[in-house]
Each structure stands twice: as structure tokens, then as C-alpha cells.
Design a protein with these regions (language model features):
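Membrane-interface junctions at the ends of membrane-embedded or membrane-associated helices
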Residues: 10-14, 56-69, 97-111, 200-209, ...
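Extracytoplasmic
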Residues: 206, 283, 296-453
Length: 453
């Protein structure tokens, strides 16, 4: 991410120190510190700044090679996560309009349309096989989006997990939020100050290179308006209307963007770029003294975002249980782990099974998700009746070959004895309180008969 933003900023400043400041301001912004411990897909956003570079080069000289580069960048970002797909579509759409409406790029219109259509079709062909599964999800109402929208407190009050936030709390100031809130999207005082100077510089500049940075003012304003979510009138009516977020909520696919505050990612990128513009102007005017000030401010902005007193404490080793490593030595077959935590109060523990599956890479039934297809829920509920015969029959028809029973966990301790006695399951191995059962093929299972009346 830092390298991508550095390259983008250098193209606007031709100043590596200023570009470095922009890169660090975005890479270590609090939004990324906030999501970096739980939503890794939300920090895999380095393709967005690269898309600006690729699109700029294509608009300058629309060759098929440059189109292929831009399309590839767009597709790779979209595949990272649906949120990132929406963010790059919004960012690139804005930049495309800027290039042709404001900067007056004038390539041959017919060539532009042809290449644009080909690129769009190619991107759709690659992304759709993955994206189509998102359309089982339902859109959230304005009331939900309103509760996950950014606000001035979230943007400008240092969180309690920063040095400044701790200082404010120590002096009795109420307002700092904790790091685990979706609306804790602190922008950073140093970055906002530098970006404000960058706005002035780009608006007053006479050289074409610096004037081009005005695009990031537009990007920041649009991102902020989207991050603020729906209007109060939309919340009251229960339907999206004419707010920027509400307008996008009417677009299929884009309507699945549930949490407006996450548009702050684009706002952070815009602020970082404008901060780089301010630093470059400082260097041009004051030379070495300006560079010294930039280095000092860069250290301060990093300190501004530095996370202290993280609620989860220091990361602790979390080894994969040996039973999953043993599965890697067995023939291919899908794996079910129990107890199943999906759709329970302990839903977050379901993701552990996804992590454990990296030890064997067999197909796994378990997994955390925002929403489950109804057919999957029905089948999974039958399998969770383990070790009932109906559960075994469902496993056979769906290709589930192995069942890991964590008998030491609440909700699983009473399943061990019936499982060991069941003719449908064969105990393969035991590691402490973790038991691995194999689903016995139907041909090898004695017929189940009902007791005579």
C-alpha cells in the first residue's frame, strides 16, 4: 500500500519525501489500524491508488495494453472484497469523469468507447462468477446504515486507543471512542492540517501538475458525503432517497455496502494525497528547512495514529490443533467441525475453523459469513444433529467425509458417547479432547431398524 500511494503521490509532486509522507499518512491511518486486526480485506486496498495511475496513463494514450493494465488492477481490487469493489468503482468513476470533463483529455471518441466496452465486459466476465453469490444478501434499511455512519466525533476526536485519546481521558474529556467501533474513523489532526494546506496550495497553484491535485479535493468531499450515510428524513421514512449514500443504495450491487463509515477509506486517501501536496510546496519554498519540518510532521502523524492499550492485548500464539494437521494426511473429503457456532452468540468463533482448515486445505462446511443461503442453513442444521442417522445420511449425500468433535467445548461434550456408539461414524484418531470421526459409507453401515411395537 505504501509503495502504491508513494508512486501516485510522486506523479503529482515529483518529490519523494512528500510522496513518502503521503504514503505513510494513508498506510498507517487509524482506519487501517482499526480494521487491520479483524477485517484484513479492508486494508487490501493498494489497487485503488494504482488504478488512478493506470487510468491516467490509459486516458493519456488509450492503447490496448494500457487498458489491460487498468482492467487487471480493477479486477484484482474487486476480488479482494465486495466493499473494495464498490470503493474502487466509486473512486475510478469519479476520476474518469474528472479526466475527461475537467482535464479535457481528448482521445478519439470511438476508440475510447470501444476500449471502454471491452474492458468493462472483460472485468465483468472475471468478477461475476464470484460476485453473483453476493446477491443472496439483503440490503439493510436506512436505520441500520445511519447507526454505522461516520460523524464529526469519529473523524476528529482522537480514539481512546491513541496517545491523544489517553491524554483527553486523563483530563476528564469525554468523547474518545474505543478502537472496535465501526464509526471510530479518526482522520488525524496532523494529516487534516496538512491536507487543509494542500487544498489551499492546489487551489492557488498555477502549475498544471499541482492543479491536477484538485481531484483529491473532489474525492475527499464525495467520500465524506457518502460516509455520513443517509439523511434523517430517509431514516424516518424507512427508504433511501436523495442523499449521496441513498442514491448509491438504489444501484444493484452497490446497495450491499452496509456501513457508510467505511467510505472513510477514500477520504483518508484523499487527505494523504493533499498532505503530500502541502509538503511538496513546503520544500519548494523553504528548501532544507521545509524538508526538516516535513520529517518532523511525518513522525508526529505516525505518533498520532499509534495504537496504545489495545483491548485485545498483545497478539498471542494460536496454533492449529493437531487433529487438523492429521487430516492433511488423509484422502480428500469435506470436513465438519463441531460445535458449530454459526448463527449463535459465539458466531465469531466459527472463523477459527476457517483458519484451522489451512492446515489441510480440504473443503470445509464451517465458516463465518454475513449471511447464509437458505439451502445451506437447512443442510447444515441437519448435519449438526450429529451423530443422528439423518445427519450421517446428509453428510454422505453432500460429500462430508470427516467430523472433528471438540468434546471439551460447551455443547459438544454430550455428543461423544453417542458418536462412538453409532454405526454411521468411525473414530479415526483422538488428540486430547479433539476426536476425528470418519463418516462410514452407506454400503458398510448396518441397516437401521425401528424397535417392534
Amino acid at each position: 500500500t505504501a509503495a502504491a500511494v508513494h508512486w501516485l503521490a510522486w506523479r503529482y509532486t515529483r518529490d519523494h519525501l512528500a510522496a513518502m509522507t503521503a504514503a505513510l499518512a494513508f498506510t498507517f491511518c487509524f482506519f487501517r489500524m482499526h480494521h487491520g486486526h479483524g477485517h484484513l480485506n479492508l486494508i487490501w486496498c493498494f489497487w485503488i491508488p494504482l488504478s488512478f495511475v493506470a487510468m491516467d496513463r490509459w486516458a493519456e494514450r488509450p492503447t490496448w495494453t494500457r487498458l489491460a493494465v487498468w482492467t487487471t488492477v480493477l479486477v484484482l481490487q474487486a476480488l479482494a472484497a465486495w466493499y473494495q469493489a464498490v470503493l474502487i468503482v466509486v473512486a475510478d468513476a469519479l476520476f474518469l469523469v474528472w479526466l475527461f470533463a475537467v482535464e479535457r483529455r481528448t482521445p478519439r471518441f470511438s476508440r475510447l468507447i470501444l476500449q471502454g466496452l471491452v474492458g468493462a465486459l472483460a472485468a465483468f466476465a472475471v468478477v461475476w462468477p464470484f460476485a453473483r453469490y453476493y446477491f443472496i444478501l439483503h440490503s439493510e434499511p436506512p436505520s441500520y446504515a445511519s447507526g454505522a455512519s461516520a460523524d464529526l466525533v469519529g473523524w476528529f476526536v482522537p480514539p481512546e486507543n491513541t496517545w491523544l485519546g489517553q491524554w483527553l481521558l486523563a483530563h476528564g474529556v469525554k468523547g474518545p471512542r474505543w478502537i472496535w467501533g465501526e464509526v471510530t474513523v479518526y482522520l488525524g489532526w496532523i494529516v487534516v492540517g496538512l491536507a487543509s494546506a494542500g487544498v489551499v496550495v492546489s487551489m492557488r497553484a498555477r502549475d498544471a501538475l499541482t492543479r491536477r491535485a484538485r481531484f483529491f479535493i473532489l474525492l475527499g468531499v464525495v467520500a465524506a458525503m457518502l460516509a455520513l450515510g443517509p439523511f434523517p428524513s430517509e431514516v424516518a421514512s424507512g427508504s433511501f432517497g436523495w442523499s449521496p449514500f441513498g442514491l448509491l443504495a438504489h444501484v444493484p450491487g452497490l446497495s450491499l455496502f452496509r456501513i457508510p463509515a467505511r467510505y472513510s477509506e477514500l477520504l483518508n486517501l484523499a487527505l494523504a494525497m493533499l498532505a503530500g501536496i502541502a509538503c511538496a510546496a513546503l520544500h519548494r519554498r523553504f528548501g532544507l528547512r521545509g524538508r526538516a519540518v516535513t520529517m518532523a510532521l511525518t513522525l508526529l502523524l505516525l505518533a498520532d495514529f499509534y495504537v496504545v492499550k489495545f483491548p485485545g492485548g498483545e497478539p498471542q500464539p494460536f496454533p492449529v490443533p493437531p487433529v487438523y494437521k492429521y487430516i492433511a494426511t488423509l484422502p480428500a473429503g469435506a470436513v465438519l467441525s463441531l460445535p458449530d457456532y454459526a448463527r449463535t452468540d459465539l458466531w465469531f468463533q466459527e472463523a477459527d475453523y476457517q483458519y484451522f482448515s489451512t492446515a489441510h486445505w480440504h473443503p470445509a462446511v464451517n465458516g463465518d459469513a454475513r449471511e447464509f443461503p437458505p439451502q445451506f442453513v437447512e443442510v447444515a442444521d441437519r448435519m449438526k444433529r450429529f451423530p443422528d442417522p439423518d445427519a450421517a445420511a446428509t453428510m454422505r449425500t453432500t460429500g462430508v467425509k470427516y467430523v472433528v468433535l471438540h468434546a471439551g467445548q460447551r455443547g459438544a461434550e454430550d455428543l461423544l458417547a453417542p458418536a462412538e456408539a453409532s454405526p454411521d461414524f468411525r473414530l479415526l484418531v483422538r488428540f486430547d479432547r479433539d476426536y476425528l470421526f470418519e463418516v462410514v459409507p452407506a454400503a458398510s453401515t448396518p441397516a437401521h431398524t425401528s424397535a417392534a411395537p
